[in-house]
């Protein structure tokens, strides 16, 4: 794979420059910008002479209540990331407009919507800016109806004013912030890093082939610090094209969550070389071509991993309940009324309730997959095939976060249940399935993976390159090996070998065939349940993902 192909995957963060930076920085310095929009005012601030060099420190007041952000470069530098070329005592209007354009790449810190600048000290959208202004201009007494743990994202931000305000305050929004006219050097560098990251993420997800329609703004993850324990509280994004099927492989429910169009004839998948960074684990993937030049690997591997790890870690954090919430739920005394409610469920009711919970989890898995760098550039057929055959496997990995192995408990929606209460079933084969799922999840939990390692592991499981039916195997192989290289680095940095030369990574890879077996057992159990209870209706996405006519072909490869 050459430089241009890595640039296709990782966008403006590739290639890195010789000084450890990224090529995107120099690109952003000289972008031509339109004149300042109406209402934007430039304020001249006093300048100082430092060692004979004039550094004009300018501020910018974008909108009412906005912080005047510093655009001056650090001492000794003539220009910074935002392209602020200083001439005399005045800042170029194009450069000032560029500042706002660069900041707006970063989503609103409160809800994840498109930001419009720095407001009250925090990068936010117009909606959250106005909400915070109103909350400060009048006496308010907001109340939370949901235990003060509501999701605050673009879809849900108006549902709970209390949690929205608390998040604004937690992020540092303040009326006093308006008085401070410029960012510190450390703050500027942090914003620069965020801009580079979001540029790379947008390029990786929007520069896809014509057959993959992807709304980058719509798919920007919320930066919410709260998350419902109940997975169904996290809605999927709906597409206006959800009434279309896709190539016979995906129906309305999956296309709604994937935001894809019906496939046009003779679509060409993106062209990725068969070259890839090799991964020297016990698993030896099928060879599909040559490898990257050794000198190039040595120069590039660290930068690839850095972008990949950051993308996956954020995707994981935004599609899972916070660990703090999970631990808090385990510390609470048991809710007897909820325990009695679940104990009184019939076999059929428990089946449907599990399907409902699993569907909510899979909605988040789909969102996670779309944020894996390069995933949205695969052909649509391969994207859907990987999700259909891998979503149940990822659900098992995610279940490991919701288990207390010492107490033998599981967080099931919004209630903590003893695992033994989940094993009751009429058919011994169903008991074997449930026990197998919990055993696999407990094995992962006992390895004490970090959140970053769990994110990388999910990427490995989903991108397992030998799934039957995939067309773009070289591309999937490439993405898989990038994740493998990053995963190996994380594991070697954080974990000692388990026994002899057996590593944590060896154990994790050895569990993947078990996941596939459990996925098949789930399909067989579903088939038996449908035969015995044909009148029961399952959630549309669940029914579509686990339709026997398609998934069995994929998983039996």
Curated annotation (Swiss-Prot):
Q: Does the keyword Oxidoreductase apply?
A: no
Q: Which residues, as ranges, make up the DNA-binding region of this protein?
A: 105-180
* SUPFAM superfamilies cross-referenced by the UniProt entry: Glucocorticoid receptor-like (DNA-binding domain), Nuclear receptor ligand-binding domain
Annotated region Disordered: the residues are 1-34, 203-230
Q: A cellular component term (GO) from this record?
A: nucleus
- SMART domains attached to this UniProt entry: HOLI (SM00430), ZnF_C4 (SM00399)
Cellular location(s)? Nucleus
Q: What induces it?
A: By ecdysteroid.
Zinc finger (NR C4-type) stretch: 108-128, 144-168
Keyword set for this entry?
DNA-binding, Metal-binding, Nucleus, Receptor, Transcription, Transcription regulation, Zinc, Zinc-finger
> What is an example of a GO molecular function annotated in this UniProt entry?
nuclear receptor activity
Q: Where are the transmembrane segments?
A: none
UniProt superkingdom: Eukaryota
Q: Which residues form the NR LBD domain?
A: 304-548
- Bias regions of kind Polar residues — which residues? 21-34, 215-226
Q: What does this chain do?
A: Putative receptor whose ligand is not yet known.
The similarity annotation says: Belongs to the nuclear hormone receptor family. NR1 subfamily.
Q: What is this protein called?
A: Probable nuclear hormone receptor HR3
Q: Which organism is it from?
A: Galleria mellonella (Greater wax moth)
Gene behind this chain? HR3
């Amino acid at each position: 794979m050459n430089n241009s192909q890595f640039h296709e995957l990782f966008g403006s963060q590739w290639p890195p420059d010789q000084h450890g930076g990224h090529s995107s920085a120099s690109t952003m310095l000289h972008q031509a910008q339109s004149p300042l929009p109406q209402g934007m005012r430039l304020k001249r601030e006093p300048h100082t002479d430092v060692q004979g060099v004039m550094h004009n420190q300018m501020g910018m007041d974008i909108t009412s209540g906005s912080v005047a952000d510093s655009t001056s470069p650090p001492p000794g530098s003539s220009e910074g990331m935002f392209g602020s070329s200083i001439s005399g005592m005045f800042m170029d209007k194009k450069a000032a407009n560029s500042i706002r354009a660069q900041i707006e790449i970063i989503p609103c810190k409160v809800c994840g919507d498109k930001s419009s600048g720095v407001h009250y000290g925090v990068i936010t959208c117009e909606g959250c800016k106005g909400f915070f202004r109103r909350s400060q201009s009048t006496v308010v007494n907001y109340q939370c109806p949901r235990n003060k743990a509501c999701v605050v994202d673009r879809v849900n931000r108006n549902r709970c004013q209390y949690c929205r305000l608390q998040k604004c305050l937690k992020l540092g929004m303040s009326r006093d912030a308006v008085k401070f006219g410029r960012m510190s050097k450390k703050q500027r560098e942090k914003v620069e890093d965020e801009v580079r990251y979001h540029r790379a993420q947008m390029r990786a997800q929007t520069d896809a082939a014509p057959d993959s329609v992807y709304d980058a703004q719509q798919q920007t993850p919320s930066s919410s610090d709260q998350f419902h324990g109940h997975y169904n509280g996290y809605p999927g994004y709906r597409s206006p094209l959800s009434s279309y099927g896709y190539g016979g492989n995906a129906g309305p429910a999956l296309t709604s969550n994937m935001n894809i169009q019906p496939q046009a004839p003779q679509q060409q998948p993106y062209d990725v070389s068969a070259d890839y960074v090799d991964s020297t684990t016990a698993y030896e993937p099928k060879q599909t071509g040559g490898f990257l030049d050794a000198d190039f690997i040595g120069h590039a591997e660290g930068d690839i991993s850095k972008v990949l790890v950051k993308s996956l870690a954020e995707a994981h954090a935004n599609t899972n309940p916070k660990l703090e919430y999970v631990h808090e739920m385990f510390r609470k005394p048991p809710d007897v009324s909820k325990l009695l409610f679940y104990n009184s469920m019939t076999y059929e009711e428990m089946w449907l309730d599990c399907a409902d919970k699993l569907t909510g989890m899979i909605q988040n898995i789909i969102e996670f997959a779309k944020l894996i760098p390069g995933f949205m550039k695969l052909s649509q057929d391969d994207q859907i095939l990987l999700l259909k055959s891998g979503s149940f496997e990822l659900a098992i990995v995610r279940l490991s976060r919701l288990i207390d192995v010492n107490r033998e408990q599981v967080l099931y929606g919004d209630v903590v249940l003893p695992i033994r209460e989940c094993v009751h079933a009429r058919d011994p084969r169903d008991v074997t399935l449930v026990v197998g799922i919990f055993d696999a999840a407990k094995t992962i939990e006992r390895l004490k993976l970090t959140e970053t390692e769990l994110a990388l592991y999910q990427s490995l499981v989903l991108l397992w390159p030998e799934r039957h039916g995939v067309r773009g195997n070289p591309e999937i192989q490439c993405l898989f090996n990038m994740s493998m290289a990053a995963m190996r680095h994380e594991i070697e940095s954080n974990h000692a070998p388990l026994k002899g030369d057996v590593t944590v990574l060896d154990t994790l890879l050895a569990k993947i065939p078990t996941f596939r077996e459990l996925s098949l057992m789930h399909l067989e159990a579903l088939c038996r349940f449908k035969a015995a209870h044909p009148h029961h209706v399952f959630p549309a996405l669940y029914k579509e993902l686990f339709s026997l006519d398609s998934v069995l072909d994929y998983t039996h490869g």
